[in-house]
Amino acid sequence: MRVSLFAALLAFSLICWPARAPAVECRALDFHDKRYTVCEVDLTQEKLRLFLRDVAGNPFKGFDALKRSLAGQGEHLLFAMNAGMYHPDYSPVGLFVTGGEEISPLSTASGEGNFFLKPNGVFFVTQSGAGILETSRYAQRHQPVLLATQSGPMLLQNGEIHPRFIAASDSLRTRNGVGIVSPQRVVLAISDSPVNFYEFSLLFRDALGCKEALYLDGSISSLYSLKLERNDNLKPLGPIIGVTR
């Protein structure tokens, strides 16, 4: 039987050029007897966005309100996660930049709580890719950013775990954070069972291949994933990071 040239070329292309990986890939991951959900975002294909308030100026406080707002603009939420700590009025603690506009300034203050467990840091995205910098180092840069959120503590700096973390710590919480695989690949993770800071840092370093990672929050940690059919609605949220289509 004669095979057309087109069919032969099509078969060859399917063998030699496999389907492109999804731009947002969420999956379960078991690491050191703990379960995590990990979402990787390819910035060459998708754009990360930060959300805080709707067009009327009201804080979203969660994924459902964000979804409704986006739907009114003809957009759909693919993935989202809480993206930093906030004050009682849901305003960000520290730097918050969305759409290139600074909503809240960088904080170099000292204080109580995880945000001030220094070194803390900033996750940011520019035209050339994503990065995480310790707060004082970020303060020295002057290039524009598309988005940025400040939080703390840093989980990893140049592959080194935060010096105040204790491997055997009994401070166990649901936690979420963000790490840099490469300037064009960002990984966000949430623990599906309580973990300590040290365990969470090991996840980013040893399982996800990050050298820089930043803690986003704990206890309120929440995930929305269209692919996984997951929509956490645990507690009110402040800043939210996500991908839309």
Question: Language-model features: where?
Answer:
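Short, solvent-exposed aromatic-acidic interface loops
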Residues: 53-58, 136-141, 191-194
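Zymogen propeptides
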Residues: 17-114
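Short acidic-glycine loop/turn motifs at beta-strand connectors
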Residues: 42-45, 89, 124-129, 157-158, ...
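Bacterial N-terminal signal peptides
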Residues: 7-15
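Positively charged n-region of N-terminal signal peptides that target proteins for export
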Residues: 1-5
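Active-site-adjacent helix-turn-beta-strand microarchitecture at beta-sheet edges
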Residues: 91-165
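Conserved, well-ordered active-site substructure
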Residues: 93-111, 164-212, 221-245
